[in-house]
């Protein structure tokens, strides 16, 4: 099949979170299955600064939005044997950040990503690439299924092209003031409750949910959750209406990149059969971060965006307990300014057993996955989560809240001693999280039992193979609906 993957970020060209990892690894997995998969994204300043062989493709597009014409140019690179196209427009994409500064989103985001989506459709024609499926990711690409269903339904070029729209996080819907519809190039007649209007605002994700041939999200539990008032973020009714066309597929990870037996970014390699190297990784991590080098002290790691969704409020509440405990805790993260300020304030107190690392530090993340004994994910909600999959791959036992993709991927040791791969808690409270940590510590003291838990996690298939197979099935379903 011919598949175009459209995303606002793709690793390693640009990334702010797990979306970029998915849109890099899934195309590669599908390519290995024999499909002609290509990827397209904006050409951000950070992509221009990479040494990934981005070159000009000598194709251009012109997009008119609200009376102004914007020109785009196509660039091309590759991830392995997957072609990657990048849409260039310096006004829109040559900026320090992808979506906004720490103070807030860029006010012209509707126009920026409308330009991107409309350019994508033009460039397909310039390249004469007619995909069977266009797979769109999150609100930044939502305009593509909307255009193909409501504006270009009679365009013969796309007559046999189906759309699949993936919701990676329903909390980010592409909500804008009503006048922003003019910035997208869509007719104002679509600003109705039937299509794009949402409590007086423009909602791009709502439009994509209503117009895509099929919709996916990134775990089966999250699929069920988002059709309820608790987790539906106001779109539960729209999602329930499309419930038969909504599928949950758990993400995988790139098991070549995330492989403790071969990872050159960590201090010492190891495997499920030969775990000795992990102890060396722990000691080196402790030394690098200026913590006491203590092999027997349990070390909890956390690599996270600093956002309300990720349970950072619970972490802040737990920090005094952690500081007074016999544990060590390492946090790496960047994000919300108020969390940065509060974590900086705690860091200034100088607790010897706590290392708080704020800002983007790519080299440190794999060292934390490898050197930690436990990995904390106290998420308020979690559509899928990749960190728990990476942690298990590295023999680091996850302690997670029992929600979304965490529920689908981490088996609680307390409930299932012979199958368990981690420790879970239900209530979103610091006490519930601490109780799960204490259960994990009790397990940690039984070294032989702990090694069995580690190995179960390391043996779990967290690759993209199964997920890619499910996407392949959905692509065929979507394409069949277009062929009638």
UniProtKB/Swiss-Prot annotation:
Keyword Aminoacyl-tRNA synthetase: no
UniProt keyword annotation of Glycoprotein present: no
Substrates-to-products reaction catalysed: [(1->4)-alpha-D-glucosyl](n) + ADP-alpha-D-glucose = [(1->4)-alpha-D-glucosyl](n+1) + ADP + H(+)
E.C. code: 2.4.1.21
Keyword set, alphabetical order: Glycogen biosynthesis, Glycosyltransferase, Transferase
Gene Ontology MF terms: alpha-1,4-glucan glucosyltransferase (ADP-glucose donor) activity; alpha-1,4-glucan glucosyltransferase (UDP-glucose donor) activity
Gene Ontology BP term (one): glycogen biosynthetic process
One Pfam family here: Glyco_transf_5
GO cellular component labels: cytosol
Pathway: Glycan biosynthesis; glycogen biosynthesis
Residues that bind ADP-alpha-D-glucose: 15
Family: Belongs to the glycosyltransferase 1 family. Bacterial/plant glycogen synthase subfamily.
Physiological role: Synthesizes alpha-1,4-glucan chains using ADP-glucose.
Identification of the protein by name: Glycogen synthase 2
Naturally occurring in which organism (per UniProt): Geobacter sulfurreducens (strain ATCC 51573 / DSM 12127 / PCA)
Lineage of the species this protein comes from: Bacteria, Pseudomonadati, Thermodesulfobacteriota, Desulfuromonadia, Geobacterales
Gene name in the database record: glgA2
